[in-house]
Amino acid sequence: MGAIKISPDYNWFRSTVPLKRIIVDDDDSKVWSLYDAGPRSVRCPIIYLPPVSGTADVFFHQILALTGWGYRVIALQYPVYWDHLEFCDGFRKLLDDLHLDKVHLFGASLGGFLAQKFAEYTHKSPRVQSLILCNSFSDTSIFNQTWTANSFWLMPAFMLKKILLGNFSSGPVDPVMADAIDFMVDRLESLNQSELASRLTLNCQNAYVEPHKIRDTAVTIMDVFDQSALSMDAKEEMYKLYPNARRAHLKTGGNFPYLCRSAEVSLYVQIHLRQFHGTRYAAIDPAMVSEEELEVQKSFPQTTVEAEES
């Protein structure tokens, strides 16, 4: 059994944070699964959107760390949606059901792409206050699979899993990263054929982000510079798309830094969210913010943040 799955932190998380299931569509089979932790008085929480192979609990490190600092954190698992518009409409209904007018979104890989599409979808009546995009992309054509996107629903689960496992690191990795990969493989095994097929369809369906619709959104781009499924060209395209974005660079972390470099990822999320302290868009309980921190935040520069190897 994987080290993460039997770790004290993961078991503490599973025993203290309940998994909720919410239906917002007419189709009762479309169920959002989510963990909602931290002070309910916070009305602009940070919401985590997982990658193709991930479930809501892959962000358990961030939930534990950020709620300990006073933040409200929600981690989601998607229902089966087959196109981006359907996803955006369902996500909007979910926010309405949770009585959340605006939110901060952290998206990993596919989650980051969907976060951008939702910000674009709601640009006339904005629901997204800020974005943190981790190992993410802005154009699905980078995967060269737009021509197969409409056939994933026909493929058996074992074939879909084989496609996804091909993106996991196969070379030598450090023990912490190996544990993260084992955990993600376990999470992948928990997804059924429809869930896998719909996520791969969303990941590869021909689509791109229209940046002019979300140019006023605060963005942090978080990239890892070792073994990642994303090419350097895809990362450079993100930098061009968001020239004013803050950049959080991790030298190592692979495809799943939120698991194997969780302390650094949580720190950069905290740095990103500090710009909203003292406003109605704060994701933190005001009682947890000191006057000194607010003063420091007023002079906090837009910058690139580098992480040293652990």
UniProtKB/Swiss-Prot annotation:
Give this protein's Gene Ontology molecular function annotations.
Answer: CD4 receptor binding
- Output the superkingdom of the source species: Eukaryota
Keywords tagged on the record: Cytoplasm
UniProt domain AB hydrolase-1: residue ranges = 87-159
The cellular component terms of Gene Ontology attached to this UniProt record, alphabetical and capped at eight, are: cytosol; trans-Golgi network transport vesicle
Instruction: Check the record and name the InterPro entries matching this protein.
Output: AB_hydrolase_1, AB_hydrolase_fold, Maspardin
Q: What is its main location?
A: cytoplasm
Asked if the record carries the keyword Chloroplast, the reply is no
Q: Where in the cell is it found?
A: Cytoplasm
- Which Gene3D superfamilies does the entry link to? alpha/beta hydrolase (3.40.50.1820)
In which family does this protein belong, per the annotation?
Answer: Belongs to the AB hydrolase superfamily.
Q: What is this protein called?
A: Maspardin
Name its species: Xenopus laevis (African clawed frog)
What lineage does UniProt assign to this protein's organism?
Eukaryota, Metazoa, Chordata, Craniata, Vertebrata
